[in-house]
UniProtKB/Swiss-Prot annotation:
Major localization listed first in the record, in broad terms: mitochondrion
Protein function: Mitochondrial aminoacyl-tRNA synthetase that catalyzes the specific attachment of the proline amino acid (aa) to the homologous transfer RNA (tRNA), further participating in protein synthesis. The reaction occurs in a two steps: proline is first activated by ATP to form Pro-AMP and then transferred to the acceptor end of tRNA(Pro).
Official protein name in the record: Probable proline--tRNA ligase, mitochondrial
One matching Pfam family: tRNA-synt_2b
Domain of life of the native organism: Eukaryota
Disulfide bonds: none
UniProt similarity note: Belongs to the class-II aminoacyl-tRNA synthetase family.
InterPro entries to which the protein is assigned, alphabetical: aa-tRNA-synt_IIb, aa-tRNA-synth_II, aa-tRNA-synth_II/BPL/LPL, Anticodon-bd, Anticodon-bd_dom_sf, Pro-tRNA-ligase_IIa, Pro-tRNA_synthetase, ProRS_anticodon_short
Keywords: Aminoacyl-tRNA synthetase, ATP-binding, Ligase, Mitochondrion, Nucleotide-binding, Protein biosynthesis, Transit peptide
Gene Ontology terms: cellular component: mitochondrial matrix; mitochondrion
Enzyme class: ligase
Catalysed reactions listed for this entry: tRNA(Pro) + L-proline + ATP = L-prolyl-tRNA(Pro) + AMP + diphosphate
Assigned EC number: 6.1.1.15
Length: 475
């Protein structure tokens, strides 16, 4: 009996120790206000910042590798860190931005009837051999063998896999069509020369959708539906985009369009008609052609970053894998297909490329990792008394503006001046920065509010701050 009591006391002591440890971790990660929720503090963020140019170069290896603004800025502020050529660690801020982008994509895909699935990254070689793409893709396809000698590839795309999946459902009815299946997963491509950070890597996130329809007419209607969803997506992100006619490439099909962001470092050459907005990749239109095929107006040339691609596949894949549906007369017919890609991490990097200044990151408002950064006074300064005032403002924001919970950072590095912390906040591109300076000691207190996207700086009372932040939309 005594031994049992001893063991019980030991277990109780261990449990108490574990509880104290958990409380310690929570205390270290957050500041907790009396009677309030937890404050998210910047000092606990795993975010290497303010890397010097030589440090950034040492991460990527060669000065020639740092040829675009988004790559340089994302490395400098610690949004990404290289793991190997073409592969990057995505740091917490970046993961938050990617997750927000995926939420926006989910909203648009599900608004048109998309159903989200998840297919394996490992794809059997026999699927790719059936379409001849095992050889056609060449060295870009990352291949491997398991211990039994079976060959696989790390999928750069999933036309074969999804068509085989749908073909396995023997009782697919016309009533289930159109069928729109999509996923957001890691993709792999053995790029011969990875460059531009997340713009051209060997491992990346991609949204790929595959559609199945009962006729060519219905499939082309679905094609237009998905293209319209892409247009809405880029409009919501506040990005200027072009929909350009494009080559079908190794994916195949009979019609293809690229969604491009115009930018000087873009690797795609495009021709554009300013009159009717016709645009095409030069892969399908000879540069010597100076006249628009639609309106006969003059064509101009520009460069772009491809962030989306759509294909009308017809029955190229469904005929190989026998993906059938039963029509209203009980007949088995081949499904008409389309496939649609969005480069998730590429969209993020391309948005930073086109929106940022040379020294400071600017995000699409919806994708900013955190919407607000609150900067208290420096410890020991004349404004120290305003610390409690601005911390109470932080807590009041959490209570009064529920959509911003988890979206507001308190920069508690009070050993630094306000100016140094404002400089960091400006580099990271929080849409709003709230500063407690000397005017926070006035009655009523006034806070300096920076709107990073517009460059506007205003002084607002607590009520004014609340009114401003209430209008912030978060996904």
């Amino acid at each position: 009996m005594e031994g049992l009591l001893t063991r019980c006391r030991t277990l109780s002591a261990l449990a108490a120790c574990s509880l104290r440890h958990c409380r310690y971790i929570i205390h270290k990660c957050y500041h907790r206000a009396p009677g309030r929720g937890q404050r998210l503090v910047l000092s606990r963020m795993f975010q290497p910042q303010n890397l010097r140019e030589d440090q950034v170069l040492s991460l990527e290896g060669r000065a020639s590798d740092l040829t675009c603004k988004s790559q340089r800025l994302m490395l400098q502020v610690g949004l990404i860190l290289p793991a190997s050529p073409g592969c990057y660690h995505l740091m917490p801020y970046t993961v938050r931005a990617v997750e927000k982008l995926v939420r926006v994509i989910d909203q648009e895909m599900q608004a048109i009837g998309g159903q989200k699935i998840n297919m394996p990254s490992l794809s059997p070689a026999e699927l790719w051999r059936a379409t001849s793409r095992w050889d056609l893709m060449g060295r870009e396809l990352l291949r491997l063998r398991d211990r039994h000698g079976k060959e696989y590839c790390l999928g750069p795309t999933h036309e074969e896999a999804v068509t085989a999946l749908v073909a396995s459902q023997k009782k697919l009815s016309y009533k289930q069509l159109p069928l729109l299946l999509y996923q957001v997963t890691r993709k792999f491509r053995d790029e011969p020369r990875p460059r531009f950070g997340l713009l051209r890597g060997r491992e990346f996130y991609m949204k790929d959708m595959y559609t199945f329809d009962s006729s060519s007419e219905a499939a082309q209607e679905t094609y237009g539906l998905v293209c319209d969803a892409y247009c809405r997506l880029f409009d919501r992100l506040g990005l200027q985009w072009m929909k350009a006619r494009a080559d079908v490439g190794s994916i195949g099909g009979t019609m293809s369009h690229e969604f491009q962001l115009p930018v000087d470092i873009g690797e795609d050459r495009l021709v554009v008609c300013p009159s009717c907005h016709f645009s095409a990749n030069t892969e399908i239109l000879d540069l010597s052609q100076k006249i628009c095929p639609d309106c006969q107006g003059p064509l101009t040339e520009t460069k772009g970053i491809e962030v989306g691609h759509t294909f009308y596949l017809s029955t190229k894949y469904s005929s190989i894998f026998n993906a059938l549906f039963t029509n209203a007369h009980g007949e088995s017919l081949l499904a008409e297909m389309g496939c649609y890609g969005l480069g998730v991490t590429r969209i993020l990097a391309a948005a930073i490329e086109v929106l940022s200044t040379e020294d400071c990151i600017r995000w699409p408002r919806l994708l900013a990792p955190y919407q607000v950064c609150v900067i208290p006074p420096k410890k020991g300064s004349k404004e120290t008394a305003a610390t409690e005032i601005v911390e109470k403002l932080y807590d009041d924001i959490m209570e009064a503006v529920p959509q911003l919970r988890g979206e507001v950072l308190l920069d508690d590095r009070t050993h630094l001046t306000i100016g140094n912390r404002l400089k960091d906040a400006n580099k990271l591109g929080y849409p709003f920065v709230i500063i407690a300076g000397k005017r926070a000691l006035e009655d009523p207190a006034h806070f300096e509010v920076w709107s990073q996207n517009t460059g506007e700086v205003v002084f607002l009372t607590k009520e004014g701050v609340m009114e401003l932040l209430t209008g912030v939309h978060v996904v």
